[in-house]
């Protein structure tokens, strides 16, 4: 399972600082490519800085979760979690200046539906966009064009271990082996809220699914005034391993701090950065050096020859019916 997975080996990182370095490196590499192309200067004011890219990623990740939350038919939580993880992984090594997060977020959701075997047709999927039939068709063409790129950038590691299954497992375990808590279901709603909030942070890239699930349950218990330390020491048999117990408590504290310090992007800042992003993707700046590179394919047969203006007619406002 998780401990033998590609997620543990390749997509679980040691620290927030390591994630920041990866994102800064992706930003730097794109700037170098754009400058080498001869179209822009090294200090061009339209370049986005790493912290600006992060703000845009936060915004589009939130849009991704909103899109999934109102999706029809209802999207399983595992699919939502997988889509969210794909998005996080993609922008660890790629810049929003090269690949627009609007289409990447939809491609992540589309691919997650396939991988998690959520049976929804392509027309059904784009039917959730607030667009004309022609606009939905264009959006689907873009999604299909970017799908292989996304798979490649994920290094073909498509199986995602979400915290939802261990979360249910812990609740069952508490019901059967922890009689001190009569009705563990009272923890569910607040724990679900915690899982929704932590999904917006980098926790999925730093901690194991079971650690996230357990933190959600114990945080919910704490908010309800219920002490569950004895569950860790007795039921999970950590009483004799004080070092392991101490490490687990430190991890849970770090996760709670991640949630506390998360700041949603301010709408005013996002509006400015979105304008900057659109200029990065405009044909006159030519930061997307080669059309087929922008599409992510090396074979000309895969590349859509549609002009840029037609391709980008749909906008963020077209993402969902009910936002």
Curated annotation (Swiss-Prot):
Keyword check for Cell cycle, yes or no: yes
What GO cellular component term, any one, is given? transcription factor TFIIH core complex
Concerning its family, UniProt says: Belongs to the cyclin family. Cyclin C subfamily.
Give a single Pfam family match: Cyclin_N
Reply yes or no: does the keyword Nucleus apply. Answer: yes
Which InterPro entries does the record cross-reference, listed alphabetically?
Cyclin-like_dom, Cyclin-like_sf, Cyclin/Ssn8, Cyclin_C_2, Cyclin_N, CyclinH/Ccl1
Domain of life, per lineage:
Eukaryota
| Record-level GO BP terms | protein stabilization; regulation of G1/S transition of mitotic cell cycle; regulation of transcription by RNA polymerase II; transcription initiation at RNA polymerase II promoter
Enumerate composition-biased segments (Acidic residues): 310-323
The UniProt function text for this chain reads: Regulates CDK7, the catalytic subunit of the CDK-activating kinase (CAK) enzymatic complex. CAK activates the cyclin-associated kinases CDK1, CDK2, CDK4 and CDK6 by threonine phosphorylation. CAK complexed to the core-TFIIH basal transcription factor activates RNA polymerase II by serine phosphorylation of the repetitive C-terminal domain (CTD) of its large subunit (POLR2A), allowing its escape from the promoter and elongation of the transcripts. Involved in cell cycle control and in RNA transcription by RNA polymerase II. Its expression and activity are constant throughout the cell cycle.
List every position bearing Phosphothreonine: 315
SMART domains named among the record's database cross-references? CYCLIN (SM00385)
Record NCBIfam families = ccl1
**Alphabetical list of SUPFAM superfamilies matching this protein:** Cyclin-like
Residues bearing Phosphoserine are 5, 132, 304
**Subcellular location(s) per record:** Nucleus
Tell me what this protein is called.
Cyclin-H
The molecular function GO annotations come to: cyclin-dependent protein serine/threonine kinase regulator activity; kinase activity
Summarize the subunit comment: Associates primarily with CDK7 and MAT1 to form the CAK complex. CAK can further associate with the core-TFIIH to form the TFIIH basal transcription factor.
Q: Which UniProt keywords apply?
A: Cell cycle, Cyclin, Nucleus, Phosphoprotein, Transcription, Transcription regulation
Q: Which PANTHER family match?
A: CYCLIN
Specify where the region named Disordered lies, as residue ranges.
296-323
